[in-house]
From Swiss-Prot:
It catalyses: L-methionine(out) + ATP + H2O = L-methionine(in) + ADP + phosphate + H(+); D-methionine(out) + ATP + H2O = D-methionine(in) + ADP + phosphate + H(+). This is Methionine import ATP-binding protein MetN. Its EC number is 7.4.2.11. It is found in: Cell membrane. It comes from the Bacteria. Residues 2-241 form the ABC transporter domain.
Length: 341
C-alpha cells in the first residue's frame, strides 16, 4: 500500500514561490497499476519523484509499505530505494556500458558478486526481450530497446514498486504499446505495484486500474479508469477522454442544424457488457422511433470496455424522451443531451 497524506512541494526562487504539488492525498493498492495524468506543468513528475525522495516534500507524508519515506535515515533510504525503483522518460543509460553492464550496474552498487549480477541481468534480458543484444551499446539500440534496458535495470534489485515517469512519451505508438504490454507482463510475473506518470490517456486506458488527474499541482479527479471514462467530472478530464476516444462529433452534427423542435441529438455512454448488446435496436423498437447513428467508438480498459454513440432522434415527444432516457438508464447507459430543437 502506498499512502500520500497532504503532500505539498513548494519551490522558492528569487522572484516568487512555486507551489508544484498542492495538498495531494492518494491511496494506491498493492499490486495495482495506478496512473497519474496531467498536462505539462501539472506537477505529476514532481509528485512521483517524491515517492523515492528524489524530491523532498515540503510537508506531508509518503508512506510505502509502512515506511514514511521522508522520515528515513540516509542508510534506510538507500535500502528503500532498492525496493522503489524508477524508469525514466529519456532512459538515463550509461553510454559507455553494454546492455548487460547497464543492468548489472545497480547490482554492483548493492554489493552483488559479478557472477550473481550477471545471472540476474541475463534473466532480465530474457524477460524484456533483448536476447542477443546483451553486448550492444545504447547508441546501437532503438528507442524501444533503450527503454527495455531501462526497465530491466529498474527491476535488477527486485523492487516492490516500479515508478514510470513518462516512460513511453519519447516512443512511437507501436513501440509504446509494446512497452505497455511488457509492463503488464512484468507486473503479473513480479507482483509489482506500478505507478505511471503520463500525459497520454491511451496509456491510462491500456494498463491502469485507477487514475488520478492533476492540474496546477492538485488532484482534481480520481477513480477507477472505467468510471472516469464513463463519466468524467472535470473539464480537464473530459478533454483527455475526448482525445482518446476520438470524440469530435461537433462536425458530424452541423448538417442537421437547425433541429426541429421535437428533435434531439444525444450522446449515449456505454460500459462493460452493454457495449456488445443491441441496445439501440431494442430502444428503437420499444419506443417506435427512428435513431440515426452519427458517430461511435468503443475502447478497451483493464476494467472492461467503454464507448459512446452520438445519435440523432428526428422526432420524439418530450414525455416519450424522458421514458426513453429512463429505459436506457435501466440498461446502465448514460444519456447526455447534446442538442435539442
Amino acid at each position: 500500500m502506498i499512502e500520500l497524506n497532504q503532500v505539498v512541494k513548494r519551490y522558492h526562487t528569487k522572484d516568487k514561490d512555486v507551489l508544484a504539488v498542492d495538498n495531494v492525498n492518494l491511496n494506491i493498492e498493492t499490486g495495482s497499476i495506478f496512473g497519474v495524468i496531467g498536462f505539462s506543468g501539472a506537477g505529476k513528475s514532481t509528485l512521483i519523484r517524491m515517492f523515492n525522495n528524489l524530491e523532498e516534500p515540503t510537508s506531508g507524508d509518503i508512506i510505502i509499505d509502512g515506511d514514511n519515506i521522508n522520515k528515513l535515515s540516509k542508510a534506510e533510504l538507500r535500502r528503500k530505494r532498492q525496493k522503489v525503483s524508477m524508469v525514466f522518460q529519456h532512459f538515463n543509460l550509461l553510454w559507455s556500458r553494454t546492455v548487460l553492464r547497464n543492468i548489472t550496474f545497480p547490482l554492483e552498487i548493492a554489493g552483488y558478486s559479478k557472477t550473481k549480477a550477471n545471472e540476474r541481468a541475463k534473466e532480465l534480458i530474457d524477460l524484456v526481450g533483448l536476447n542477443g543484444r546483451e553486448n550492444a551499446y545504447p547508441s546501437e539500440l532503438s528507442g524501444g530497446q533503450k527503454q527495455r534496458v531501462g526497465i530491466a535495470r529498474a527491476l535488477a534489485n527486485e523492487p516492490d514498486v516500479l515508478l514510470c515517469d513518462e516512460a513511453t512519451s519519447a516512443l512511437d505508438p507501436q513501440t509504446t504499446d509494446e512497452i505497455l504490454d511488457l509492463l503488464l507482463k512484468i507486473k503479473e510475473r513480479e507482483n509489482l505495484t506500478i505507478v505511471i506518470i503520463t500525459h497520454e490517456m491511451h496509456v491510462i486506458r491500456r494498463v491502469c486500474d485507477e487514475v488520478a488527474v492533476m492540474e496546477s499541482g492538485r488532484v482534481i479527479e480520481q477513480g477507477k479508469v472505467t468510471q472516469v471514462f464513463e463519466n468524467p467530472q472535470h473539464e480537464v478530464t473530459r478533454r483527455f477522454v475526448k482525445d482518446d476516444l476520438d470524440d469530435d462529433f461537433e462536425e458530424s452534427i452541423k448538417h442537421l442544424e437547425p433541429l426541429d423542435s421535437d428533435a434531439y441529438i444525444v450522446r449515449l455512454n456505454f460500459n462493460g457488457g452493454n457495449t456488445t448488446e443491441p441496445v439501440v435496436s431494442y430502444i428503437s423498437k420499444t419506443h417506435n422511433i427512428d435513431i440515426n447513428i452519427l458517430e461511435a467508438n468503443i475502447k478497451n480498459t483493464r476494467g472492461g470496455s467503454v464507448g459512446f454513440l452520438v445519435v440523432h432522434i428526428p422526432h420524439i415527444a418530450e414525455t416519450e424522451f424522458e421514458t426513453f432516457k429512463e429505459d436506457l438508464h435501466q440498461q446502465h447507459v448514460n444519456v447526455e443531451v447534446v442538442k435539442h430543437g
